[in-house]
């Protein structure tokens, strides 16, 4: 019997293990020098002004929206076709998530759809760089600038992504994820990246109890005695155990993303005649991070629905993922917004399937997945 091929597996090697061991032996395992190293390395690699490590991208989104003063009576524009944490945070802050539809084939919002959704109550716009591809930032920034509304880029899928001549995270405000399946992982973690000095200071304050100065003194490895709480804050800091893994992973990003690109190219070659629909890549110049490789399983074309297709792959010892079920189709939001209709999000939500993709996969693994897909579809077409 074949071994189980998971949808994703972190590419953890001896360097990451040694980095964790070094932190454990250092006597300082919470937020400290490895956090500083991670933030510094990210800024140097991508030309960012500020990078603030947090315990998750969700935590990062929370403190960014808090720092921007988002609250009751405000509206925040976001796609529904995203991980539900963004919509949850907006809702928990007492604001209204204004969910807009996406392009059918890139899964990203357009500047036109965002512009139509702007009202006098709009206080932020959160586009998602999807699956490793960048949004059309020029168009989105033009809309946001014209309206005087902050743009917060959800870059959880986009570490190592370029839009035209800039890295994602080089300009503006972006939030990155180091979750277990991401291109750079430390199990759980994230970064808030911004070129706004005031926003960076507030995020640093809010993510660690509201302390008004850097709480870690690198000379004595402890909390500065003069640190004072200047506003209520949260406990969203990242431990050095996690940060040490991310530092090594970040140094390996080019190598790992190159392997992802190789695997995706092979998938695309072998599936080009399949009734499965692959995502389109943006027409504007970009560098794709290939975070996910997704297909759409349309029953009309494939003779099988997505859920059955995923189950049959599981029976063949192949894992898959769903990224994502549109937020407005989830029970809570379905009941809260019963008349909301977003046709492209709904169709993709019902047909999307993420195939196995991670740096330690081999070309033989891709061929195995493709052969299994062909066997399944041949039974239904």
Curated annotation (Swiss-Prot):
One of its GO terms (biological process) is lipid A biosynthetic process. GO terms for molecular function: pyridoxal phosphate binding; UDP-4-amino-4-deoxy-L-arabinose aminotransferase. It catalyses: UDP-4-amino-4-deoxy-beta-L-arabinose + 2-oxoglutarate = UDP-beta-L-threo-pentopyranos-4-ulose + L-glutamate. GO terms for cellular component: membrane. The modification N6-(pyridoxal phosphate)lysine is found at residue 182. InterPro entries: ArnB_NH2Trfase (IPR022850), DegT/StrS_aminotransferase (IPR000653), PyrdxlP-dep_Trfase (IPR015424), PyrdxlP-dep_Trfase_major (IPR015421), PyrdxlP-dep_Trfase_small (IPR015422). Its cofactor is pyridoxal 5'-phosphate. Pfam families: DegT_DnrJ_EryC1. Pathway: Nucleotide-sugar biosynthesis; UDP-4-deoxy-4-formamido-beta-L-arabinose biosynthesis; UDP-4-deoxy-4-formamido-beta-L-arabinose from UDP-alpha-D-glucuronate: step 2/3; Bacterial outer membrane biogenesis; lipopolysaccharide biosynthesis. Its EC number is 2.6.1.87. Keywords: Aminotransferase, Antibiotic resistance, Lipid A biosynthesis, Lipid biosynthesis, Lipid metabolism, Lipopolysaccharide biosynthesis, Pyridoxal phosphate, Transferase. HAMAP family: ArnB_transfer (MF_01167). This is UDP-4-amino-4-deoxy-L-arabinose--oxoglutarate aminotransferase. It comes from Proteus mirabilis (strain HI4320).
